[in-house]
Curated annotation (Swiss-Prot):
<dbReference type="GO" id="GO:0005737">
    <property type="term" value="C:cytoplasm"/>
</dbReference>
<dbReference type="Pfam" id="PF21016">
    <property type="entry name" value="RlmN_N"/>
</dbReference>
<feature type="binding site">
    <location>
        <position position="121"/>
    </location>
    <ligand>
        <name>[4Fe-4S] cluster</name>
    </ligand>
</feature>
<dbReference type="GO" id="GO:0046872">
    <property type="term" value="F:metal ion binding"/>
</dbReference>
<feature type="active site" description="S-methylcysteine intermediate">
    <location>
        <position position="335"/>
    </location>
</feature>
<feature type="binding site">
    <location>
        <position position="118"/>
    </location>
    <ligand>
        <name>[4Fe-4S] cluster</name>
    </ligand>
</feature>
<dbReference type="GO" id="GO:0030488">
    <property type="term" value="P:tRNA methylation"/>
</dbReference>
<dbReference type="GO" id="GO:0070475">
    <property type="term" value="P:rRNA base methylation"/>
</dbReference>
<dbReference type="Pfam" id="PF04055">
    <property type="entry name" value="Radical_SAM"/>
</dbReference>
<keyword id="KW-0698">rRNA processing</keyword>
<feature type="binding site">
    <location>
        <position position="292"/>
    </location>
    <ligand>
        <name>S-adenosyl-L-methionine</name>
    </ligand>
</feature>
<keyword id="KW-0949">S-adenosyl-L-methionine</keyword>
<keyword id="KW-0808">Transferase</keyword>
<dbReference type="InterPro" id="IPR007197">
    <property type="entry name" value="rSAM"/>
</dbReference>
<feature type="disulfide bond" description="(transient)">
    <location>
        <begin position="107"/>
        <end position="335"/>
    </location>
</feature>
<keyword id="KW-0408">Iron</keyword>
<keyword id="KW-0411">Iron-sulfur</keyword>
Amino acid sequence: MQNKIILENMTVDELKEFFVNNGEKPFRALQYFQAIHKNRIFNPDEMTNFSNSLRGKLNQYNDIKNCSIIKRIDSKLDNTKKYLIEMSDGNIVETVFMQYKTHTSICLSTQIGCKMGCKFCASTKKSFVRNLQPYEMCAQIYLVENDLDIRINNIVLMGIGEPLDNYDNVSRFIDLITDKDGQDMSIRNITLSTCGLVDKIIRLANDDIGINITISLHNPFDNERNKLMPIGNKYSIEEILDACDYYFKKTKRRIGFEYTVIENVNDSKKYMDKLVSLLKNRNCLLNLITLNPIEEFNQKSPDRYKMTEFMEYMNKNNVNTTIRRKQGIDIDGACGQLRINNMTKRGVK
């Protein structure tokens, strides 16, 4: 008997091989792919264009993994909706839906937990469990779209986990979600956030995937950044910037930099001037983020006047800078917070 496989992780060409090897016509591959990624039919018994015999084969060989929404919280302040989604093995990830005037966006998790250990990020406060598979990333989108009866326009890989630490599965997910016969998401509407895995940034450039990337910078001085973000002990800021320059040269995609502003820690003129020296000659966008305080990181958020002062100083010095609009702050909107609270209530360490 053939070993169980996860057909939802397969491209159309891979599905063709599967169907032919099991005595079926190649065109069945496209039908199956569209059932999953276009029509949101996940149960082979509901694929009425397949014979009973073929449905039986799919049930026999396919290791069907169902994901489900276990909790949804709606913000009372904006149109943000925070989801807890349970994987087939019982692990839980966060997914955030955001509604804007011009588009919809979804923030996806790529791992269960995170290895990176950034001090101010709730995602790292419970142990790393495993990487998410491609179908589990797709499922976050499809479940939310079905729940809200909407079409999502933009994807940001900024949820729980470091996407480039799960490179193979994330790149496969991008292949699936951008396939014209499925979700047909524009590659230009996908943004990946990374803490700066230099080797993977270079690989991403060489693989010519063409998505947008944004770097979690948060401090312009290596010796201080290392204390906030342990990955800095492996890759210096200079190495990260060199990799970003290479990515821009290969893809022509403007690089984003994220900078969480922490009161009396990284918000003085000294830090602004250093950022200017690092970024002023680069085709980039600096995105200032107000710190979302968590219990394990006892620091304060700056007020809006300080944020505006920071932004104006950077723009005056030729660094294109914006302030990220805070979404869902009344529903533990920052990455990982809702999952942590849920795990704590259940006594999960």
